[in-house]
Design a protein with these regions (language model features):
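Short, solvent-exposed loop/hinge segments that bridge or flank secondary-structure elements
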Residues: 21-73, 132-135
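Well-ordered beta-strand positions in beta-sheet-rich domains
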Residues: 61-65, 84-86, 111-112, 137-139
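General N-terminal targeting signals
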Residues: 51, 55-57, 83, 91-93, ...
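Intrinsically disordered and other compositionally biased segments
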Residues: 1, 13-16, 46
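Contiguous, well-ordered beta-strand patches that form the walls/edges
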Residues: 43-46, 69-119
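Sequence contexts marking disulfide-bonded cysteines in secreted/extracellular proteins
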Residues: 8, 59-61, 142-144
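Beta-sheet ligand-binding and adhesion/scaffold domains
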Residues: 12-24, 96-147
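C-terminal motif of bacterial Sec signal peptides marking the signal peptidase cleavage site
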Residues: 3-6
Length: 147
């Protein structure tokens, strides 16, 4: 969409392009599907995937808890933040699902993409290259229910 604004006092015209926001795409994965207790580990080298999954499974001794937020999101940590906050699951083209702050489009620089999810194991990659270089690819392995 192109919007034209005219300035009557100077006689000049300025064109402003307003980006069109398409309809919001629902996420392929629902917040309720990722809530619960997870073992968590990360890797930088793809060859370390299986070893890291085993480490994540062992991480259930000190599980990372993903809870439902008060407005339908999930409570998780943003990079470099001590306190967890409510984040949104956002849908993207190609049936992708992202986790990130509300109010930002899916696939934004603060988002992480769920690259794999089978209900038991979830693989997540940060989109910001600098953050990804520090945190690596995260693997969450669902922990058994407490006895």
């Amino acid at each position: 969409m192109l919007a034209l604004a005219a300035c009557a006092s100077s006689g000049t015209q300025q064109a402003t392009v307003q980006p069109g926001l398409g309809p919001e795409i629902p996420p392929a994965i629902k917040p309720q599907e990722i809530t619960g207790r997870w073992g968590l580990a990360a890797f930088h080298n793809p060859q370390d995937l299986k070893r890291t999954e085993t480490a994540a499974r062992n991480g259930c001794k000190q599980a990372y808890n993903i809870a439902m937020g008060p407005t339908g999101g999930v409570i998780m940590h943003m990079p470099d933040k001590a306190q967890p906050e409510e984040l949104r699951l956002k849908g993207g083209p190609g049936n992708k699902t992202f986790i990130g702050p509300q109010g930002e489009p899916a696939g934004g620089p603060q988002d992480r993409e769920i690259t794999s999810f089978d209900g038991r194991v979830m693989t997540v990659k940060f989109l910001d290259p600098e953050v990804s270089s520090r945190y690596g690819t995260q693997i969450y392995v669902r922990c058994a229910p407490r006895a």
